[in-house]
A protein has these predicted regions:
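Amphipathic alpha-helical segments within well-ordered protein domains
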Residues: 19-22, 36, 53-57, 67-71, ...
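Mid-chain, well-packed structural core segment of small domains
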Residues: 42-67
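Short alpha-helical scaffolding segments that buttress acidic/His motifs in well-ordered protein cores
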Residues: 13-17, 34-41, 69-74
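Amphipathic alpha-helical interface surfaces
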Residues: 9, 31, 48-52
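Alpha-helical scaffolds flanking conserved acidic
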Residues: 29-34, 64-68
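Acidic, glycine/proline-rich low-complexity segments that act as flexible tails and inter-domain linkers
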Residues: 1-30, 58, 82-95
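C-terminal structural segments of small proteins and small subunits
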Residues: 70-85
Length: 95
C-alpha cells in the first residue's frame, strides 16, 4: 500500500512539477533552478537542495551563480539555513 502511494506521489511530482511548472514559458530553466535553490534553502531541505544543485549545473548555472544565490538566500532566510545549504552544495559540487 505504501509503495503504491509513493508511486502515485512520484507520478504527481513528475506531471505537475516537471511538466506543468518547469515547462511553462516566462522563465528559463537556469532561472527556475536558481529560484529552487533559494526556496529549498529557505525551507531547509538538504536532500532536495543537493539534487537541485546537480540540476542547476545541468541547466547551465555556474558555480558562482549557485554561490551567489545561496548568499542572497542567507540574508533573507537566516544564516543557519544558508550554512546548511552551502555545506550540501559544496558536497555536491566536490568543493
Amino acid at each position: 500500500m505504501l509503495a503504491t502511494a509513493v508511486g502515485s506521489l512520484q507520478e504527481l511530482v513528475t506531471e505537475y512539477c516537471w511538466g506543468a511548472i518547469w515547462g511553462r514559458p516566462g522563465l528559463d530553466l537556469k532561472t527556475r533552478s536558481l529560484l529552487n535553490l533559494a526556496m529549498l534553502t529557505a525551507l531547509s531541505r538538504p536532500h532536495e537542495l543537493r539534487l537541485h544543485v546537480r540540476g542547476a549545473l545541468n541547466n547551465g548555472c555556474t558555480r558562482e551563480e549557485i554561490r551567489e544565490t545561496l548568499l542572497q538566500a542567507a540574508v533573507y532566510c537566516g544564516i543557519p539555513a544558508a550554512l546548511d545549504a552551502f555545506r550540501n552544495a559544496a558536497d555536491e559540487l566536490g568543493d
